[in-house]
Amino acid sequence: MLEKVFKLKENHTDVKTEILAGITTFMTMAYILAVNPSILSAAGMDQGAVFTATALASLIGTLCMAAFANYPFALAPGMGLNAYFAYTVVIGMGYSWQTALTAVFAEGIIFIILSLTNVREAIFNAIPACLKTAVSVGIGLFIAFLGLQNANIVVGGSTLVQLFSVDAYNQANGVEASFNNVGITVLLAIIGVLITAIMVIKNIKGNILWGILITWILGIICQIAGLYVPNPEIGFYSLLPNFSSGLAIPSLAPVFGKLDFKNVFSLEFVVVVFAFLFVDLFDTLGTLIGVSTKAGMLDKDGKLPRIKGALMADAVATTVGAVLGTSTTTTFVESASGVTEGGRTGLTSLTTAILFGISLFLSPIFLAIPSFATAPALIIVGFYMLSNVAGINFSDYSEGIPCFICIAAMPFCYSISEGISMVVISYVVINVLIGKAKEKKISVLMYVLVILFILKYIFL
């Protein structure tokens, strides 16, 4: 039956290889079950409910990939997109998280429509490759900066940010924490970064997840030894899992179906939706093409067969995920780990999806993982995304300067959408003024985007 459904022989694989590949993929991306609730809780969302939404969205999205495209790719709420959701749309722009979920839902619907037509190719071809790369790099820096903040390695100060000290932390947050509250967690986070980095260099499977778990375990040891002292009143909780409710699945009720359509006709809301769509679209296409190239899945013309099904799985997962109560669900680049293990069909995805289902019953473990343990994951994921900077031709200043503006704007303006706006405007304006617009083959769509972004800055 499995042979008939997944065409294993045709894809030169077998059941054992596919299952092992699915387990490997899950190990490399399971960190999202701890990181996503942590990030979205900063937007005021219930952490337990977001955990359940994250697991379910990952389960459904990955199943869709297996069913629609028969590819070994897994989906989950995307890093960068969740940070944009919480820190830019909600905290920075002042929208409620319910409105932000509505923007994700709208993006998913648009993505479904684009996936049913050839519009996605037109959009993909309209944006220069260097700008797509710059967006990825900028998000990487933004994520790494969030990791440094979540670990309290950097704190607010008279110089906007400064290296951690207990006094600086207390002054920035208006609390009276001690070394045994915050100081030890900073040291543990730094150790976690080093441990994760070593495992990445050694190419250990599941390095990011293992980095989180090891950092957390070291924290538990410190708590038992009295080096870490919980103080819930100022945000430092016990690191031990709370099994008082058994292995019950946290209720979805606080976030399920909480869409708010009041602001959907505002220009700023449209910009937010576009930012979600832009990043999701190019992140998905980049992941699909990059991983499938590594696996030798492209046809003789360099195209990915059944890409429409893969994009549809991504679009459906995003739409369903928004209703469940999580930020944009997208294809994970960590799928490459399963492909490296020999995964070639949807059976790999099915295996990963089943493991996400099992994880629903392990919420006390994932929800007990502190931000200082997940911060190293953010920093290392930031490194992965930053490594794409090699694809930008900085010797061509007409490309390099706009890309630099994008990369710098995202962390320094604390906004992914501002980086996207600035790179599109600067790229078009610079190349028009120096007479390179025709040479660069700037599309009509790019000019339309420039007008929209300029209107945003004038009227918002």
What is the meaning of each model-derived region?
Residues 93-217, 350-460:
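Membrane-embedded alpha-helical modules
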